[in-house]
């Protein structure tokens, strides 16, 4: 019965990994990166008469900034992400224990075990551990993506989100971005760099044959997973 339970557990784990591989990302599958469209005003609201000469609903400003500031406006983000991380760890432990017991005297004479053997003896214990670890990681992401303003917060900051898909031969490459933007950080040409976005979520990946070639199969992921004994 135990062997049957183990076999069923392994099969269920394999199926989970397999299902994950069968559902790669697709355009529009995540609402967190879906575009936001401008809200069309209700004609009934525009026809309301308040008695004043000026109406904010039908006002046409003479001068207006081209920067994104309303839900549905488009903002271009230049990706300049670069991270360099390096970590070194060295551990050395050493312990030496030495114990010496001298022969005792009895009636002024050393105690003997016979045949000339003395009770003098030494105990020497040495333990040593050396450990060393090193990790180096470099990441760089450059490019651009246009996103839309999803929401304007009470303090004027804007929540932006969007994705870009590019099909190259037999595969797709995508960039997804979401975060919070300050209006002061938007340049005059309606662009902003990714390092000025708060709470940024940037994803870059791909689907297709090339991406599948660079990924491990479901059985390899099980064998190299943390649950498999080394």
UniProtKB/Swiss-Prot annotation:
Residues 1-18 form the signal peptide. One of its GO terms (cellular component) is bacterial-type flagellum basal body, distal rod, L ring. InterPro entries: Flag_Lring. The keyword Acetylation does not apply. A lipid is attached at residue 19 (N-palmitoyl cysteine). It is found in: Cell outer membrane; Bacterial flagellum basal body. GO terms for molecular function: cytoskeletal motor activity. Keywords: Bacterial flagellum, Cell outer membrane, Lipoprotein, Membrane, Palmitate, Signal. Its main location: membrane. It is a lipid-anchor. One of its GO terms (biological process) is bacterial-type flagellum-dependent cell motility. The keyword Signal applies. A lipid is attached at residue 19 (S-diacylglycerol cysteine). Belongs to the FlgH family. The basal body constitutes a major portion of the flagellar organelle and consists of four rings (L,P,S, and M) mounted on a central rod. Assembles around the rod to form the L-ring and probably protects the motor/basal body from shearing forces during rotation. This is Flagellar L-ring protein.
């Amino acid at each position: 019965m135990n062997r049957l339970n183990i076999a069923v557990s392994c099969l269920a784990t394999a199926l989970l990994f397999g299902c994950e591989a069968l559902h790669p990302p697709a355009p529009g599958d995540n609402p967190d990166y879906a575009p936001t469209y401008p809200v069309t005003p209700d004609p009934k609201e525009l026809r309301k008469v308040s008695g004043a000469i000026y109406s904010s609903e039908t006002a046409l400003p003479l001068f207006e900034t081209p920067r994104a500031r309303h839900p549905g406006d488009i903002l271009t983000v230049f990706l300049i992400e670069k991270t360099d991380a390096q970590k070194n760890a060295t551990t050395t432990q050493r312990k030496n224990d030495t114990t010496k017991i001298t022969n005792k005297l009895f009636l002024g004479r050393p105690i003997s075990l016979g045949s000339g053997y003395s009770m003098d003896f030494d105990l020497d214990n040495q333990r040593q551990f050396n450990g060393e670890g090193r990790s180096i990681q470099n990441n760089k992401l450059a490019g651009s993506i246009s996103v839309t303003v999803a929401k304007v917060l009470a303090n004027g900051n804007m929540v932006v989100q969007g994705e870009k898909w590019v099909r190259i031969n037999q595969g797709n490459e995508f960039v997804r971005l979401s975060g919070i933007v300050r209006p002061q950080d938007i340049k005059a040409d309606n662009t902003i760099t990714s390092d000025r976005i708060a709470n940024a979520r940037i994803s870059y990946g791909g689907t297709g044959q090339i991406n599948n070639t660079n990924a491990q199969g479901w059985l390899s992921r099980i064998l190299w997973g943390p649950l498999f004994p080394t």
